[in-house]
């Protein structure tokens, strides 16, 4: 997914970070404090940047409908930088406090129209006994979806296109609680709320999405395995406010999902670590629309599947690199009323890349700086 931000990325996150720093108890002269700077850079090739269907790819490559596309090429090379600032306090006896602010983005070699920026805030409280509470917020000011048909648009001249740039702002708030169980088992429960607000012309697509998630994992020193199950319920506005009832699309949906993630360490020598990971994801979405004119969403069911594998190497303690490959597919099954020539909504996407990240301690009390700690 990609987006382009043009306004200040959620200053409320900065205010919240300052409030958390004041709220979290910090002992005077505590030697367990530190301030870390994290940097990262990912470069990746994407075979289907905006997840177009086969019908849309044919239209784009033929040049028969240039008004329906704002990209130069359907595949592209993307650069994704990341910068974070994290404050951590170790109070002893298993109590840890963490506040992290992170900024990230994605910038494309040819398709600058799909560039994006985002900011996030994380507050984590760890307790003895392997308990952990995490609160997080994420702000994406402007996400470019694609060109969509605007039935309410009035072109200045006859024959001009009614396709418009569809983009939205996305805000996410989440909470999760992780608990260690007897042996190597861990369990985590989480909740997430997403709010999408589209630009004028596509207000009927505004939505709020609830997501509940449960995960169970097994963690060893050199291997880990985790399974997740989730359920999503997206409620769309489905009205654009023009006073005409029933003529707008309803993009609301509901359905289950989940996945399995595994990690294993192949080799270690000194500070060097070599590890591999594999993740499988699946999701089923049943659209809620019951409108006669909304043939693209009425009685529609989507089935999405993704697989990702990676190879990670760490040469120094706080720097590492990861090569990865990801394949994602979506099978959109439309209702009987949909036109045979309608865009099927299915897509196939490959993504392969290389990611680097490193962490540098900017500050810690003198007493702690002289000691050593395991990262």
Question: Which ranges hold each PLM region?
Answer:
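Outer-membrane beta-barrel translocator domains and adjoining extracellular loop/strand segments
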Residues: 49-56, 100-101, 109-118, 138, ...
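Repeated loop/turn-to-beta-strand initiation elements of outer-membrane beta-barrel proteins
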Residues: 92-98, 128-135, 181-189, 220-227, ...
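Outer-membrane beta-barrel "beta-signal"
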Residues: 230, 346-375
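Transmembrane beta-strands of outer-membrane beta-barrel pores
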Residues: 41-49, 89, 103-109, 137-145, ...
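Residues on the lipid-exposed face of transmembrane beta-strands in outer-membrane beta-barrel proteins
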Residues: 37-43, 79-89, 103, 121-127, ...
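Detector for outer-membrane/organellar transmembrane beta-barrel domains
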Residues: 177-196, 207-291
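Outer-membrane beta-barrel initiation region
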Residues: 27-98
């Amino acid at each position: 997914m990609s987006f382009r931000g043009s306004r200040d990325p959620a200053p409320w996150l900065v205010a919240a970070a300052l409030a958390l720093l004041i709220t979290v108890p910090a002992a005077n002269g505590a030697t367990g404090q530190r301030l870390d700077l994290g940097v990262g850079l990912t470069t990746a090739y994407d075979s289907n940047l905006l997840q177009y269907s086969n019908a849309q790819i044919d239209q784009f490559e033929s040049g028969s409908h240039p008004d329906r596309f704002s990209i130069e090429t359907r595949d592209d090379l993307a650069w994704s930088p990341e910068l974070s600032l994290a404050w951590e306090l170790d109070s002893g006896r298993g109590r840890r406090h963490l506040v992290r602010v992170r900024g990230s983005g994605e910038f494309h070699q040819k398709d600058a129209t799909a560039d994006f920026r985002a900011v996030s805030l994380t507050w984590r409280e760890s307790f003895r006994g392997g308990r952990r509470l995490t609160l997080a917020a994420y702000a994406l000011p402007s996400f470019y979806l694609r060109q969509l048909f605007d039935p309410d648009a009035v072109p200045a001249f006859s024959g001009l296109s009614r396709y418009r740039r569809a983009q939205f702002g996305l805000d996410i708030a989440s909470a999760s609680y992780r608990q260690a169980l007897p042996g190597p088992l861990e369990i985590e429960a989480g909740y997430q709320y997403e709010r999408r607000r589209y630009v004028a012309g596509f207000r009927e697509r505004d939505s709020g999405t609830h997501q509940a998630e449960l995960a169970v994992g097994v963690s060893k020193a050199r291997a880990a395995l985790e399974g997740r199950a989730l359920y999503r319920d997206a409620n769309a506005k489905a009205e654009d406010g023009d006073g005409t009832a029933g003529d707008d699309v309803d993009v609301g949906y509901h359905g289950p999902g989940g996945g399995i993630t595994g990690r294993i360490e192949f080799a270690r020598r000194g500070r060097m670590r070599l590890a591999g990971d594999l993740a499988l994801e699946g999701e089923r979405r049943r659209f809620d629309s019951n409108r006669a004119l909304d043939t693209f969403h009425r009685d529609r069911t989507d089935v999405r599947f993704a697989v990702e594998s990676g190879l990670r190497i760490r040469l120094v303690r706080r720097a590492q690199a990861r090569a990865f490959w990801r394949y994602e597919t979506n099978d959109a099954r439309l209702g009987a009323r949909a036109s045979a020539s309608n865009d099927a909504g299915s897509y196939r996407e490959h993504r392969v890349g290389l990611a680097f990240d490193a962490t540098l301690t900017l500050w810690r009390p003198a007493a702690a700086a002289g000691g050593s700690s395991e990262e």
